[in-house]
Structures are given as C-alpha cells and as structure tokens.
Amino acid sequence: MDDKHKRYFQYIISDLTCLNSDVIRVFKKVYSIDEEPELSEIVKGEVDFYSHCVTSAGIKRGLWEKVGNIKEVGEISHIIFKDKMDYTREDIKDDWRIWRINQNIIHVGKLSKENKKGFLGLVFTPEDIYYKIKNGVHYGFAAKYE
C-alpha cells in the first residue's frame, strides 16, 4: 500500500469461465509494514473484494510478493461476477451477464439487487488491483460499474 502499511490477498482458484485467470480475495485489514501475522489468521479476516488478475505478473512487476501458501480458501459458491457486454455504452442497462466461478455465464439483462453486488468479471492488470487495494475503487471506466 505504502511504506508504512500493507494488506494481504490470496489466490483462491483459476476461473475457466474468465480466461482461466487467477481469482484472488483481498482482505480488508490493514497491517503496519513491520507486522508479520500468521497466514491462518489473515485468511480468517473479512474479505474486501474478489477479482480476476494474473498474480505472477504482479510479482514480476514488483507490486506484491508471495509470502506463503495456505490451502484454506473459504467458500466460493457465493461469489458472483458480473460483466457488461458493452462498457462504452453507459446508457444501455440491460446487457449484463453474471456467473459463479467455473460455471456457465448467464445473460440476465438488467442486474437484480443481488447481482448488482457482484464483482466486476474482468481480468484486471496488477496495477489495477494495486490501485483498488490502495484507494478502495477501480480507476477509469471500471469505477462506473462497481
């Protein structure tokens, strides 16, 4: 996050529905840079958001580092991703699709109240993930659709 604070995320699964990309869960808790919490405690924390990305690219670009491996990934069946057919047309409100990890995409048209809470189903760059972790929102066009 910055030179005094850090947050953690966890790779949980690859989503064949979304280009076989990595799905991560980002935890809300902010730690001081000197803290070294147990991974088993981190993964019990509240999840801020789920997202698709390429985790290895973030390591190569120096945006994050791998600190360990823990098999506990939590329940994933409740995670809903949403995707708009045309992000250039904000005026079109009935072109949404949703899916759950590794399940079929469903064209739903307008988003229901539950589906509006879904996470954007785009494969974000490491820089996009880093920005959202640091600022709480995506930047650019994606911010309009969160």
What are these regions (language model features)?
Residues 42-146:
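Beta-strand-rich cores of mature extracytoplasmic or soluble domains
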Residues 19-45:
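Short solvent-exposed strand/turn elements
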Residues 5-15:
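Short beta-strand-centered aromatic/proline hotspots
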Residues 14-17, 21, 142-146:
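Intrinsically disordered, charged low-complexity linkers and terminal tails
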